[in-house]
Amino acid sequence: MQKITFDKSLCVRCGQCTLVCPSRIHQRQTSKDYPACVKGAEEMCIACYHCVAACPVGGLSVNGRGHDDCLEFDKTAAIRFEQIAHLIRKRRSIRHYSGAPLEDRMIEQLLDVVRWAPTAKNGLPVKWVIVNSASKVRELAGVVMNWLKTQPNTSPMVEVWDKGGDPVFRGAPCVIGAYTDDTTSHWSAMDTAIAVETFDLCATAMRLGTCWAGTFVRAAQSAEKSVIHQWLGLSETETIHGGLMVGHIGEEVYQRIPYRPEASKMWIR
């Protein structure tokens, strides 16, 4: 159970904390009242810290974390819709990498931002395994290929591998796996997809190349997944729901944004 603490000496009774609480844990009867937790409702707190972030005076805390634990808005860094739209449109799945190693600090920067990717009920179930070594990525690709060779219609990929190529990770120097413990969340796949794509877009903004590692994820979710789990150090209850190749972009250069058809829409009014 979360512990919510109000400081009446600071509270200005603006009502913002009660307004933003998704679980309606704390309420006021009138505008003159101080906010207070509904009896027994603290068990429903999802520790989203919306109330703390909305308070203009730092008048409350959750689990001892208050005003100073929430980042300030950078009002000079306002992002226009056109900038976000351009980032999404220009993002490409990159399958040719420069061969240069990827610095750990860049991965750390990206994962630091991805902490704020939305998750169902603020469950924050997504964990990450980072394979950041060309030799280890190649080794993992070999484990995936052992599974792939048992699957139908994969002979073209097997042929590429046998000739020294990498049809699994395309020669990327780094592979990111996103996983959850499926005993703790019903929304694992969706939460992971959101987190991975957040990472993906942020990596694009850092001028890194990325590509979703679908073959790796298929293998990691297959009946023979135990071999991959053992290699990655995952338990039986943990599942890889998303994977990305990441690296500095090689010779793959685009002059324009590829065509996409109009969105299929159905309006109900």
Predicted regions and their residues:
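Acidic, surface-exposed loops and disordered segments
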Residues: 1-269
